[in-house]
Amino acid sequence: QQSLLFMWTSNPHLPEALGLMKAWDFKWATVAFVWDKQRVNPGYYTMSQIELCLVGKRGRIPQPRGARNVRQFLSSPRGIHSAKPEEVRWRIEQMFPTQKKIELFAREKVPGWDCWGNGVNKVAPLVA
């Protein structure tokens, strides 16, 4: 089936992410987004503060609409553990406005997306 995969990874896990992409029968296409989390952590060789969103392709995918206007780099503070910036979803929607979308390991429901994940139906506890 024709589809695109947008997959988050950190630099230390890049080989595993590319291996998983291949196991799912996607071909590596590019890095879609580079997220500066605005917080530096110790890295293996340099200080680490980014995550990568990779793109894999399966089949023939048309050039995304408005792709020339969508920037690869974004700087946004980290939220709760493993949450990704909403802005990336908006950018994907801008590029592919009519295609169906699914988010795996989602933390919340998002209008217009099928969202699968353990946290989707959980209600955040109230803090007194």
Regions found by a protein language model. Name each.
Residues 1-7, 11-128:
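Class I S-adenosyl-L-methionine
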